[in-house]
Every structure is written in C-alpha cells, then in structure tokens.
Regions:
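N-terminal cysteine/histidine-rich coordination modules
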Residues: 1-48
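Positively charged, polar, low-complexity stretches
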Residues: 16, 20, 37, 51, ...
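Short active-site oxyanion
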Residues: 25-26, 86-87, 105-107, 129-132, ...
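Extended interfacial segments that mediate partner engagement and assembly in macromolecular machines
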Residues: 34-109
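Short glycine-rich anion-binding loops that position phosphate/pyrophosphate groups of nucleotides
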Residues: 34-35, 113-115, 159-161
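Active-site cofactor/cluster-binding pocket
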Residues: 86, 98, 104-105, 116-126, ...
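Short basic, glycine-rich beta-strand/loop surfaces that mediate nucleic-acid
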Residues: 128-171
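Charged phosphate-binding loop/patch that engages nucleotide di/tri-phosphates or the phosphate backbone
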Residues: 167-182
Length: 182
C-alpha cells in the first residue's frame, strides 16, 4: 500500500489511520515521508482537509511525521512478536542456519549490527536457497520483538507470516525511503 489515510480526530488533530479503521471521510496521500514533509511545508496537506470542512483548521503536532514512522516500526515489531508466539520464528545461529539449509526459512531477519562474518555467512546461505533477507533492525530491536537477548539471526518459517511481515517492512521502507524503496 503506497498511500496512508489521514483523518481528523475529535480534538481536531490529524491522525494517520494506518489500520484503516477510524471513522470519517479522511484523505489519502502517498505514504512517503518526503512527500508528506513537502505537503506540510507548502500547506497542501492542510488545504486538503480545510476544503471539506467549515470549522477550525486541523492541528498537526510537531512530531507528526516521526509518530507515523514509529507506528509503522511498531507494526513490524508487533508482527515479529506475534509470529514468535505462533511458533513461526526460530532464532540463534544454528537453528536459523538449519532452517535455511532445510528450505523452511521463508524470511531471514539479520540484525544490522551483528558481526560481519556471521551476517555474510547467513547472506550467502539465504542467497543459495533464494530466501529473502531483511537487515535493517539492530539487535536490540530484534531482541525486544522476540522477547530474547542478543538476537542476531531469526528465521520466519511460515509463508503467511513472512508475507505479512514483508508487507509491513515494505510499507515502513517506502515511508522512510520514498519511491527509491519500491
């Protein structure tokens, strides 16, 4: 999904409706942070709301764009945690290596701050079995999502979980990096 829906809350604050469940008409804009920054800067964003409303101008907090990124990251971390609780995540070098070699790994998560030699070994293995690898979370974030300590490698072993997680990661990447991520 390349767009983000925005609605006005009861306090007249603009809210990013990432779950697409909030009531109200709302507006949709491309979900690129750069595009949103520009539309906030030049006033386009507010004008889109004001043209449909006769009351007060909507309020946008100073941390609005950061909150969207944080919500998108929370969605990714939450899905990793849910997958773990569903038994669809293996972690630890040997378990992940084994899941790659057996073809069970649908998505490889590697901590961005893991040791270079371990990351490269996993990368080579993932490429050999054509398993997608994601390397943008630091170990602390990956560990937190999995309720463990020092997690460097994790294997998503359910294709449904891998697809859901990939979609959330893609949405976050698109928001942060814009169309270059696509």
């Amino acid at each position: 999904e390349e767009t983000i829906r925005f609605v006005i809350g009861p306090d007249n604050a603009v809210i990013a409706d990432l779950s697409e469940e909030l009531p109200g008409k709302g507006i949709r804009l491309l979900g690129y942070r750069g595009t949103l920054e520009e539309s906030l800067r030049d006033g386009t964003f507010i004008r889109l709301f004001v043209k449909d409303r006769l009351d007060d101008e909507p309020f946008i907090s100073a941390s609005f764009l950061d909150k969207i990124e944080s919500q998108l990251m929370d969605k990714v971390l939450g899905l990793i945690g849910l997958a773990r609780r569903a038994g669809a995540v293996l972690n630890g070098f040997s378990k992940v290596e084994s899941s790659l070699k057996s073809g069970k790994c649908e998505l490889l998560l590697t901590a961005s701050d893991g040791a270079e030699d371990g990351r490269m070994k996993m990368t080579r293995l993932a490429e050999a079995v054509q398993c997608q690898q994601v390397t943008f979370l630091p170990s602390a974030r990956l560990s937190m999502a999995l309720g463990q300590t020092n997690v460097i490698h994790a294997s998503i072993i359910g294709s449904g979980w891998a697809q859901r997680l990939n979609a959330s990661i893609d949405r976050l990447s698109l928001y942060v990096n814009g169309h270059e991520a696509a």
